[in-house]
């Protein structure tokens, strides 16, 4: 049985009415309008221009043409991690473009958080390597049943892709359509407004964003991407998760429980 791939997922234990706008597959501008006030304020300089209008027209047009565009809740990461809660930023590239089967229904792998997948979806290889590194750093079993990272997001880990939508089965299909300017603006605004954050930049794509952080009081951690193609070139053994917590504690912020599900 295949699920309706255009139907938005409702988060577990959600109030049926409280997050209706956040989880609807609505026009892109409507999803922005439903963001928490703090994010709308930070994003205000990034939106309202011709390039944003063109991006909205593109994404909305792809959906209107019947193309499955993932994720449904484009700004799920921003709903789970308000700007005044952010302590760590992990940058991804673009959303997963595949699907998984949960309870006999086909659903998107992407659900609006970089590297994360919904409960029940098979843990992708890059995320398995992330869990492996955490296990090595903390002396814990690296295998987790779920690849859902919402628990991290609720602790203040912003799991942000630099491109926020993708067509099913077509990796990087929404790259160079305007998302990069939006997320660059968001990263810069966040770095200017929040002190002593940790930015984890894995792989050359994420590391290209380092220029947005120069001269600002943040901890910037760089390593190869956790993909199986590059993880053994320095991601595994990088020590980033302990380094992040050491930085946070030195600056009077609570550590992240990386072992939490």
Where are each of the predicted segments found?
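Polybasic, low-complexity association/targeting segments
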Residues: 2-15, 21-61
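A polyanion-binding, active-site-adjacent surface
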Residues: 37-198, 205-208, 213-222, 226-231, ...
């Amino acid at each position: 049985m295949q699920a309706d791939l255009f139907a938005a997922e409702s988060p577990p234990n959600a109030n049926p009415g409280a997050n209706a706008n956040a989880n609807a597959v609505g026009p892109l501008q409507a999803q922005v309008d439903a963001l928490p006030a703090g994010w709308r304020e930070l994003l205000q300089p990034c939106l309202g221009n011709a390039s944003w209008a063109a991006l909205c027209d593109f994404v909305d047009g792809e959906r209107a043409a019947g193309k499955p565009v993932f994720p449904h809740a484009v700004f799920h990461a921003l709903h789970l991690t308000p700007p005044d809660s952010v302590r760590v930023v992990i940058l991804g590239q673009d959303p997963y473009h595949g699907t998984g089967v949960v309870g006999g229904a086909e659903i998107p792998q992407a659900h609006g958080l970089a590297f994360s997948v919904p409960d029940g979806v098979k843990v992708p290889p890059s995320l398995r390597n992330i869990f492996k590194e955490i296990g090595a750093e903390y002396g814990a079993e690296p295998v987790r049943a779920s690849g859902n990272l919402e628990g991290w997001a609720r602790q203040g880990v912003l799991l942000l892709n630099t491109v926020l939508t993708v067509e099913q089965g077509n990796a990087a299909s929404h790259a160079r359509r305007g998302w990069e300017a939006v997320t660059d603006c968001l990263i810069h605004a966040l770095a200017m407004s929040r002190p002593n954050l940790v930015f984890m930049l894995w792989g050359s794509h994420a590391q290209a964003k380092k220029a947005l952080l120069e001269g600002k009081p943040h901890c910037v951690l760089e390593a190869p991407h956790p993909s199986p193609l590059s993880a053994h070139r320095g991601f595994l053994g990088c020590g980033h998760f302990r380094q992040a917590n050491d930085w946070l504690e030195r600056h009077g912020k609570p550590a992240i429980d990386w072992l939490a599900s």
